[in-house]
A protein has these predicted regions:
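Double-stranded beta-helix
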Residues: 4, 59-85
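Short acidic-glycine-tyrosine-enriched beta hairpin
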Residues: 6-7, 30, 36-53
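Histidine-centered catalytic micro-motifs
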Residues: 12-19, 54
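Structural recognition of the beta-strand scaffold that forms the well-ordered cores
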Residues: 14, 23-24, 49-50, 70
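Short beta-strand His + acidic residue motifs that chelate non-heme Fe in jelly-roll/DSBH
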Residues: 14, 32-33, 56-62
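Short, conserved beta-strand element in jelly-roll/cupin
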Residues: 6, 17-32
């Protein structure tokens, strides 16, 4: 499990996870872009499900800090995330 904090305008960069991700927006406004889909705008209380291998990016589009808590289903020894150009 991890918590990520993003300042206004900050983004995660495009990346993938080798396993599923389940996230929860604690605070702020998140723009979630999943490759091949229209961007989604999420707010505090919203839940994120990311399938394994999906290319995605999270960006803080609000005026305050964005806080997201996530848990991942990964095989032992696999990296948490892999950047995508």
């Amino acid at each position: 499990m991890s918590r990520s904090d993003f300042q206004p305008g900050a983004a995660s960069g495009r990346h993938t996870h080798p396993g599923e991700e389940l996230g929860y927006v604690l605070e702020g406004t998140l723009e979630l872009t999943i490759e091949g889909k229209a961007p989604q705008r999420l707010k505090a209380g919203d839940v994120i499900f990311m399938p394994a291998g999906a290319v995605h990016e999270a960006k803080n589009v609000g005026t305050g800090t964005l806080r997201v808590v996530s848990t991942y289903v990964l095989e032992v020894g696999k990296p948490l995330a892999t950047p995508v150009k």
